[in-house]
Amino acid sequence: MERIKELRNLMSQSRTREILTKTTVDHMAIIKKYTSGRQEKNPSLRMKWMMAMKYPITADKRITEMIPERNEQGQTLWSKMNDAGSDRVMISPLAVTWWNRNGPVASTVHYPKIYKTYFEKVERLKHGTFGPVHFRNQVKIRRRVDINPGHADLSAKEAQDVIMEVVFPNEVGARILTSESQLTITKEKKEELQNCKISPLMVAYMLERELVRKTRFLPVAGGTSSVYIEVLHLTQGTCWEQMYTPGGEVRNDDVDQSLIIAARNIVRRAAVSADPLASLLEMCHSTQIGGTRMVDILRQNPTEEQAVDICKAAMGLRISSSFSFGGFTFKRTSGSSVKREEEVLTGNLQTLKLKVHEGFEEFTMVGKRATAILRKATRRLIQLIVSGRDEQSIVEAIVVAMVFSQEDCMIKAVRGDLNFVNRANQRLNPMHQLLRHFQKDAKVLFQNWGIEPIDNVMGMIGILPDMTPSTEMSMRGVRVSKMGVDEYSNAERVVVSIDRFLRVRDQRGNVLLSPEEVNETQGTEKLTITYSSSMMWEINGPESVLVNTYQWIIRNWETVKIQWSQNPTMLYNKMEFEPFQSLVPKAIRGQYSGFVRTLFQQMRDVLGTFDTTQIIKLLPFAAAPPKQSRMQFSSLTVNVRGSGMRILVRGNSPVFNYNKTTKRLTVLGKDAGTLTEDPDEGTAGVESAVLRGFLILGKEDRRYGPALSINELSNLAKGEKANVLIGQGDVVLVMKRKRDSSILTDSQTATKRIRMAIN
């Protein structure tokens, strides 16, 4: 107060005012501050001061020929003075106005193409809806967010090559466009920009916006996809928020969302297969998201999510060094620990082998709806400061932190046995056992934890075991804060290793991720996800498994047919028949398999009994380990549509229906493809035509290798011999003729010879 009075006093004297307004600023420190370095220290002042001058702008000399010296009001537009230090002329801001109104007009056709991201933003805002403003405390946490909607996901280097190729195609310099996306974009942009008059530099800037993901570390409460971030300044302040629904979606957000769903589905499916890592890789390589290969997206997309990171680790890509536990991302901010195995007893006297972390450590915990700071020592929680959107989110964070602390009172709070299993029916590790147990019910844990009186600290409040807030007492070490905890900003990526059970470890051997950490929520993907791998057939239920299995057999019929006659065991073991087994009632799987295999063997032994439709229909049943029994079946049951449906061994049924006239197969009424050969007519006519130019030598001879399909015969050299599989499922030995002249007679003799060779 005293100082303010003093200042008022001074200001009332006219001399003070004069000194402050009229004297020159000649203090060396001040002069230094404003003149050292190239960086403008007070840009807005500088701008105002410059614009107050008569000619603050410089322009190319040619402007004087294109603009009159005075405008209609008689104001001077440019000075005859040259700009000091360059050969440009000084012009007035009025010249810009004149140019905008009366200057030459170029074609505007390229504007929407070049300024695509801006035009699209305007459309999104036009169609967006802004709701009411709510005043409330905003828990914002800094997250790394994507700030330019509508971009492709090229790396800076890839984008640079594309931009150089599009904007400066004739410049020298090595540019290798390798990825699919690079080539497509380059071609597209070159076509769009023919005869474009916009300055190349501007085009380059705008292309960069379109091609590269730009991220910033910003305080956010609410949606983090780029269409929300572009209106961040309109939707949330320090104490208010405005509801907003974007007026359109952008592909980059859709890619991120669909990638997460695909990765979760793949990790969940791989975890239950015999070799999780191999399965995961096979699925990543055979999946497409919105028409782009998933592996290409994984290489370029920086999304950090547990399942996505497991897929990246499997591909040998670097991922973030933070680790995941209970759905929270933990980042150690200080301290260190060593691991030691210790046996502990639960409240139910069950022994658990824990890997105990010894030492003082501090972590930030960031989840979707809550964040926290955790300080812990060996098996002891020292302090936990939580903030979250609602009570439920805060509870989740507290449970995870308490389990992570490995405190004895937490282990003693276990009631009942711990026997949680993962999707593959394997027991979870002790830490996840404890986590699952307390996630189901944390009451005993909170009651046993203990409470303490608390000091009054600004912005912090206590929380009692029943989750009511309090200013006097709180659960030991636990406080709730109004302020969120920022996500870890460092985007460093580290080399990791992954074992066959999909556990991801850093170089020190700490587990960063495992399938247990993958979120179970199911969402609907924005872009079409195409899983080509048979392992994913079951994602859309039993019907899809049935249809896909038969489609696969029909698509690969040529090779399946050869394997069926030459190497059936290998065929029965194909992974494509694995999903089908879950449809066959467990008790009878083995008998069905034994029956079908015997039937197939008879077909191989007794000539002329080869029946394509029947083989296709029954083949998936032969994949189960067979049980020998004398049982015969006239129909086989599959569990679809919630009940058992029958497939008739001979003849059609609603499940499996082959139409002889159209040669189309329908499975459960869905089209499963067309057979390229007619199974019943026998194909002697076709074969005799195809076998023109070949001499049939007799029965199959194993020395000449496995049987080829008729289509593969064309690769033989003249005089070369080979076994060939003909339509009835029989194998004969042929030789390609040395001369073409005798081809005509072949088709007549072929039919006779086939009969002789077989009989």
From Swiss-Prot:
Source species of the chain: Influenza A virus (strain A/Chile/1/1983 H1N1)
Localization of this protein: Virion; Host nucleus; Host mitochondrion
Gene name tied to this protein: PB2
Domain of life: Viruses
InterPro entries: Flu_PB2_2nd (IPR049110), Flu_PB2_6th (IPR049114), Flu_PB2_C (IPR049115), Flu_PB2_CAP-bd (IPR048298), Flu_PB2_middle (IPR049111), Flu_PB2_N (IPR049106), INV_PB2 (IPR001591), PB2_helical (IPR049113)
Pfam families: Flu_PB2_1st (PF20947), Flu_PB2_2nd (PF20948), Flu_PB2_3rd (PF20949), Flu_PB2_4th (PF20950), Flu_PB2_5th (PF00604), Flu_PB2_6th (PF20951), Flu_PB2_7th (PF20952)
Site positions for Mammalian adaptation: 627
Subunit composition and interactions: Influenza RNA polymerase is composed of three subunits: PB1, PB2 and PA. Interacts (via N-terminus) with PB1 (via C-terminus). Interacts with nucleoprotein NP (via N-terminus). Interacts (via N-terminus) with host MAVS (via N-terminus); this interaction inhibits host innate immune response.
Gene3D superfamilies: Polymerase Basic Protein 2, C-terminal domain (3.30.30.90)
Record protein name field: Polymerase basic protein 2
GO cellular component, one term: host cell mitochondrion
